[in-house]
Structures are given as C-alpha cells and as structure tokens.
C-alpha cells in the first residue's frame, strides 16, 4: 500500500497484494478458540500466549491503573470558581480529584495541542504542561497525553524523548483506523520507541489486539471496540445493552479493551438520547459498575 497526504488525511491506494515481504519468513498465528463453557471464552489468553515474547526486558516501571478522563463530559465540571475547559485550572482540579481518590493517572485528551497543525510541540496557550506535570508529580499522579496518529508518527522519537524527560507517563494514540502492513508496522515502532523512553501506550482508534502487549508490555490497552464514547453521538437504534453482553465473548478474546465504562448518567433505550456535554449510557448504573469487573482493561477510566 502507498500513501499520500491530502490535507491532514492519509489517502490510501490499494495494491494487488496484502503485504510486501523479502525472502523466507514466518507469519503470525491464526487462531480458532474452542471452549467447553462459554464463560471460558472471555478469559482465554491464546492470542497473548502465541505472540512474540517480551522484547523490552525489565518492565517493572509499567504501572496499570485508573485514569480520570475529562473528554467524556466535555470538561464539564461544575461548582468551581474558574472557567472549566482546556486550561491549567481544570486539569489541576482533575489532578486534585485523582490524588484524593487514589486514581493513578489523569489524561489530557484531544485539545491540549494545536490539532490543526498536527504538531505535538505546539501546545495551546491555556496549558502550561511543565507546570501541570510538576503539580501532578507532587500529588503522586501521572499524566497521559492524547496524540493523533499523524502527529505522533512523523516525529515519534523526538516526541517520546521530549515528553518522557518532562515526566509524562504515556500516550493515548488515536485515529489509526486501519490494519494494513504500514499501520501494523507503525504500531510496532510506536510501542518500541515508547518503551525505549519508558512510556506506556494506549492504542485508541485501532484494530483488534494481536498480542502486541506481550511483545511490548508497555502497550497496556487497545480500543478496537464500540465503546461507551459511542453513546455521545449514537442514535436510538443503537442497542448498546445487547452489544455489551456479547462483546466479552467476541472482542475480549483478542485482548484488553479500552471501553471507557463508568457513565453515571443512565437511561433505558426509550429515554436515551445522544449528548456531547452530558452523555449517558443505555442501561443502569449498576450495569456500568459491573463492566469494571467484566471488561478486562489495564487502564480504567473514570469521569468526575
């Protein structure tokens, strides 16, 4: 596959082959999992077991945990004496919340960098990232940065080195949205370079897991799911309740899932409606709590 940049989008042109390889080589396993009981399917680790072993050596620095997430409710915190939004005051509020409640991380989702420039070194003027990182360190909270795929890919060595030295703990990389040879190669390179600088990776907007989290244990999560964020814009014909009780037996067989469960606004299907500012789940609040137990995830989101 060849690519060319049109605006900020990758334009793909198909080739009459799946992948280009040189000489003899082995190829990844293809798996058919059979279990005696359906309850064994979500805890089947065949994909992980057949992946290439750890390539990064010691990984005691990798710390799974919970993460406070501001994008779910559009930075919509209330009862504060400052204007909530993409600014230091809002993120310090999230850091304080995380510190009080034993939440290990706060994520700075889309908006902290100048997105239209696709440049992770152009930070919006309302954010002083060095100050935030220092403040979070005092509170024993780690920061994770969202990054669009294109901005991360074009200078990932420099990006990883710079933000690791600042004290950032990892990246949530988004909008890959395909699984051709070029994109699979990107995932491997991103995992390898991030590990070099002791950064964790959450692959959002990605293809299904294939065991990369064994080869590079710093890959702690994958989206690749019709997750809760879809409720921000889905219509009433979406049956998320049925999907949620089916997904563990299908998608979770491949690996951990960045579902972002935990909605505290809840509705039955008849009352559900989409909302970017005050999103809701379909189903009950107890159902959302149960998903923390059922859905395997090394980075559990919470939205104060």
In which residue ranges do the predicted regions lie?
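Aromatic- and carboxylate-enriched substrate-binding clefts and catalytic-loop regions
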Residues: 110-280
